[in-house]
Amino acid sequence: MTGLDKTNDALIEVAVLVTDGDLEILGEGVDVVIKPPAGALESMDDFVRNMHTTSGLLEELDGGITLAEAEEACLAYVKEHCPEPGKAPLAGNSVGTDRAFIERDLPTFAEFMSYRTIDVSSLKELAKRWFPRVFFNTPEKHGGHRALADIRESIQELKYYREVLFVKEPGPTSDEARAASKKFEITPQ
């Protein structure tokens, strides 16, 4: 993105990876650069311009594809691994902004995806509050703010949280889970 403003900024790179229930990546994924509309780069602030210059993304924009081509590639890949509409959640770090741009620029893809979101950043925030040792040992990121690298790092981070934050297999018995649930149930008044 040329920034985080859904009204004024442009989507300039899209990457998609589908995983199975064990967070293993299925297929090759999608990683495309989108040619921005005329004038889209002029409003980019210095921080974003420097980030995209350092990552090499700005150099690639002239060879980018259209939003329609990007949407077609994303849909084809997701449908290959999750053919039923509304079943594939959007996942990653701070994906609320991503979803806003996807809904604006890739509406057919947005409609195909589930309304549900798996935001790895939420787990990070919970770890910071409840398990600081987990938070302070989160895997380092080296993706340089490129879409595909960011997704791969989000998957690895989610695997880390699964290993260190969640109850180990087989988890509680059904009776134990019901008993715990009862402790937190709010009864109607």
Positions of PLM-derived features:
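Substrate-recognition/cap helix-loop segment adjacent to the acidic, metal-dependent catalytic center
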Residues: E80-C82, T97-R116
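Conserved beta-strand scaffold positions in the cores of enzyme catalytic domains, especially
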Residues: L90, T117-V120
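Acidic active-site catalytic centers that drive phospho-/nucleotidyl reactions
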Residues: E13, D20, D98, D119, ...
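Conserved non-catalytic scaffold segment of RNase H-like nuclease domains
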Residues: M1-L90, P139, E185-Q189
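Short conserved catalytic/interaction loops centered on acidic-Pro-aromatic/His motifs
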Residues: A110-S114, V134-T138, V167-T173
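Short, well-ordered beta-to-alpha junction loops that form the rim of enzyme active sites
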Residues: A91-G96
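Acidic two-metal-ion nuclease catalytic site recognized across multiple nuclease folds
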Residues: K141, H145-Q189
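Active-site-proximal helix-loop-helix substrate-binding element of RNase H-like nuclease domains
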Residues: P36-G39, D46-V48, V120-I155
